Amino acid sequence: MSQPTWTIRFEGYLPVDDRMEERLRRVCAEIDTLPASALHIDEAARLITIDYTQVKGLLEASREIVRTTRVGEHIVVKPPWDECEEQPGDVVIEIDPGTAFGSGLHESTRLCLRALEKYLTPGVIAVDFGTGSGILAIAAAKLGAARVTAIEANPEAVEVARANVMRNGLESVIEVHHALSPAFIGSPVDLVIANITAETITAHLDAIAEALNTGGLLIASGMTILNAPDVERLLPNAGFSMVEKLTDGQWVALMAIKQ
């Protein structure tokens, strides 16, 4: 029986200068070091091809791609350069993603926004682990969280998230910290959002469990239908029970309660 063939696509922007070819070689070399098992491909099927797309510039390209997006029932994510027609009951989040992850376009971000809209109870204390642009922390605050601690390992993303928190007028509700783990949090919280990767979630699952109150909710995404089962299998051992699984294309979000 033949195995399915998967195509994995990486997208990025490189300046067109005399070092571009060197940068491309380095990128390909890094991709080539990834184990086939992590990519869920056959070692014999590994093949890297490169396509070129000319853009006017990163800022101009992002402004063409990132537009106002409606997610779920009432969440609207808009960049500063776009307009939105606000409807009664809408929760409008203004995000300039910069170089950080979290424009609202990615499937895993949309899944987390849908889960927040469905499950967040006003007044909760929340943690956004791997906040990126800050979009999920801001969504949690606008949906009624009393306090949100957003943590991020990338210093540049920390600054992007802080700017977006200010853009939405939520400095009194959201604190953004440069940290590597939810173990950074001192007292237990009611909600942890982790839109990162399956590997990072599994590596920090015990710390996430310790950060949550009994009955607290974990919203985990950034995983695909291929590696979500790896996370799901580990949840009971960490003291979680599954509540729901959401999918969007190949992407998955898991909701689980700490017992």
Which ranges hold each PLM region?
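N-terminal auxiliary segments of SAM/dcSAM-dependent transferases
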Residues: 1-86
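Conserved beta-strand elements of the Class I
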Residues: 93-94, 127
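Conserved SAM/SAH cofactor-binding pocket of Class I
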Residues: 99, 103-188
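Conserved short alpha-helix immediately C-terminal to the canonical SAM/SAH-binding motif I
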Residues: 156-160, 200, 227
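Hydrophobic beta-strand segment of the Class I
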Residues: 192-193
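A short glycine-rich, Lys/Arg-flanked "PGG" loop and its adjoining helix->strand segment in the class I
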Residues: 202-217
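Short strand-turn motif at the edge of the Rossmann-like AdoMet-binding core
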Residues: 221-225
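Core SAM-dependent methyltransferase catalytic element
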Residues: 241-259
